[in-house]
């Protein structure tokens, strides 16, 4: 290139043969796709042990409760949603001080 601006005459293209290791992959290979029944995910029923640490549900209490559960992945996710939603756990001291309808 001579000068500050590029002109078409300054560009030289060199075409070479494609190397065998960089040939495109044949997308129409003999691979078979699974049918719809095989693609349905089966629920994972494997149970795993978890340690859950949650705060006491009383406003003035700072006790951390430890709960050990054995649950599936779906079960622990459901439990997590309960704990972050309307369900609150109480420590033994706060349970004795609260009025409740159960025994």
UniProtKB/Swiss-Prot annotation:
Keyword annotations of the record: Activator, DNA-binding, Early protein, G1/S host cell cycle checkpoint dysregulation by virus, Host cytoplasm, Host nucleus, Host-virus interaction, Inhibition of host innate immune response by virus, Inhibition of host interferon signaling pathway by virus, Interferon antiviral system evasion, Metal-binding, Modulation of host cell cycle by virus, Oncogene, Transcription, Transcription regulation, Viral immunoevasion, Zinc, Zinc-finger
GO biological process: DNA-templated transcription; symbiont-mediated perturbation of host cell cycle G1/S transition checkpoint; symbiont-mediated suppression of host innate immune response; symbiont-mediated suppression of host type I interferon-mediated signaling pathway
Domain notes from UniProt: The E7 terminal domain is an intrinsically disordered domain, whose flexibility and conformational transitions confer target adaptability to the oncoprotein. It allows adaptation to a variety of protein targets and exposes the PEST degradation sequence that regulates its turnover in the cell.
Biological role: Plays a role in viral genome replication by driving entry of quiescent cells into the cell cycle. Stimulation of progression from G1 to S phase allows the virus to efficiently use the cellular DNA replicating machinery to achieve viral genome replication. E7 protein has both transforming and trans-activating activities. Induces the disassembly of the E2F1 transcription factor from RB1, with subsequent transcriptional activation of E2F1-regulated S-phase genes. Interferes with host histone deacetylation mediated by HDAC1 and HDAC2, leading to transcription activation.
UniProt organism field: Human papillomavirus 5
Chain location of the short sequence motif Nuclear export signal per the record: 76-84
Primary subcellular site in the record, as a coarse category: host cell
Recorded superkingdom: Viruses
SUPFAM superfamilies: E7 C-terminal domain-like (SSF161234)
The keyword Iron-sulfur belongs to this UniProt entry's keyword annotation: no
Name under which the protein is recorded: Protein E7
Location of region: E7 terminal domain: 1-48
Protein family (similarity comment): Belongs to the papillomaviridae E7 protein family.
């Amino acid at each position: 290139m001579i000068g500050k601006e590029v002109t078409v005459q300054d560009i030289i293209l060199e075409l070479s043969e494609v190397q065998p290791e960089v040939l495109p992959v044949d997308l129409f290979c003999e691979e078979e796709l699974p049918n719809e029944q095989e693609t349905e995910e089966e629920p994972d029923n494997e149970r795993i042990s978890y340690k859950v640490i949650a705060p006491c549900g009383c406003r003035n209490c700072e006790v951390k409760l430890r709960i050990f559960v054995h649950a599936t992945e779906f079960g622990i996710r459901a439990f997590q949603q309960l704990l972050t939603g309307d369900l609150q756990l109480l420590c033994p001291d706060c349970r004795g001080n609260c009025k409740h309808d159960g025994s």
